[in-house]
A protein has these predicted regions:
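Extended, well-ordered alpha-helical segments in internal regulatory regions
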Residues: 8, 74-75
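Alpha-helix N-cap and loop-to-helix initiation/capping positions
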Residues: 33-44, 81-89
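Short, well-ordered coil/turn segments that N-cap beta-strands
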Residues: 58-61, 104-106
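Conserved, mostly hydrophobic/aromatic
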Residues: 64-66, 108
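Aromatic-rich peripheral "rim/lid" segments of glycoside hydrolase catalytic domains that contact
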Residues: 75-96, 100-185
Length: 185
């Protein structure tokens, strides 16, 4: 199965946004709450598939063949939409879905390693171009900054470019690109 809470922040947004009662949280706590609900939404889709298969008498492992989170969007998921796309939210979703995968024993393919700027040829900022954990040049997005610090990518490169952090590793600069999800009424 595939699950994309990122896309569902627009197409099935019941879980997405800042809920009543969360107004007094810090901005980061508001986003963390929304991202926890995104992870729970993905898990609920998995559980629905599992329940359906069980109702049919099918006893086979279920794998999440794709899930991920885009970091840039000039469409439904950007400033004029759900405001879901940025590196901070991607990092939170990546961490939460990996945590759940490890705890539950469910295999998850996180989509994807590198951005694919050729997917939406009409817009370089189209969300489908930016699901990577790395930019096309090989810069590690925020989800992997800790791995850069640990030296995991030491000696590796992409097209001759060493693996470095996006935003030159400046968390404050990265956070300035982060928008709050909309407030639910």
């Amino acid at each position: 199965m595939h699950t994309y809470p990122f896309l569902d922040s627009h197409y099935n947004p019941d879980y997405w946004g800042i809920l009543p009662g969360e107004e007094d949280l810090s901005d980061e706590e508001k986003i963390e709450s929304a991202m926890k609900r995104a992870q729970e939404f993905a898990v609920s889709q998995y559980e629905s598939v599992r329940a359906y298969m069980k109702s049919l008498g099918v006893d086979k492992p279920i794998h999440i063949g794709e899930t991920g989170w885009s970091t840039v969007s000039d469409d439904y998921f950007g400033a004029s939409g759900t405001q879901a796309a940025d590196e901070y939210k991607e990092a939170l979703y990546h961490k939460l879905i990996r945590q759940w995968s490890k705890e539950s024993g469910v295999s998850v393919f996180y989509f994807e390693a590198f951005d694919e700027p050729w997917k939406d040829q009409n817009s370089s900022d189209g969300s489908v171009n930016h699901f990577g954990l790395f930019t096309v040049e090989g810069q590690a997005k925020y989800a992997l900054w800790d791995k850069v610090d640990e030296g995991v990518f030491e000696g590796l490169s992409r097209n001759g470019n060493p693996v470095v952090k996006t935003f030159n590793g400046d968390r404050q600069a990265m956070m300035e690109t982060v928008a709050l999800p909309p407030v639910k009424k």
